[in-house]
Amino acid sequence: ILEDSLKELENRTLGRPVGERLMILGSENDDHEFINMVESCGSTFVIDDHCTGTRYFWDEVSLNGGDPLTAIAERYVNRIACPSKDWPVRTRVPHILSLAKEWDASGAVILQQKFCDPHELDIPAIKSSLEEAGLTTLFLELDVTVPTGQFKTRVEAFLEIMEEEGLF
């Protein structure tokens, strides 16, 4: 079944224009309505960096003939860090820049859960690093639920800016 699914994925198409290739960043976002709204405006999320998204699962456990429990512990300790643990060596910003390049993202939507101080403190470094790398960014702050209707206008303006930047 897995092999059949993998073959099917190779030939799969999106069924609509891709539009702007975006990445979505933040502590978490399980609001499919928000994602659908952004993509309905003419874009596609190609990668995420969330605590419970790809960051949690990034990198494999490397046994290298060693003890499995030690290998799991090393992967846990050395994985891309949550902002609250990303000190003294910062791993998250280089990881995000690598994702943007690898997935050919042209913009980033940064979702900030209100009162999540570690993520909030990371935003200036992430935003400036992405912009220096040529990505357009949109910062949206939310309080528990995503106000999809309120954010739609901002998302549309963001995508218009990206479209205009592509003209020059």
Model-derived features with residue positions:
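Peripheral docking tails and interdomain loops at the edges
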Residues: 124-168
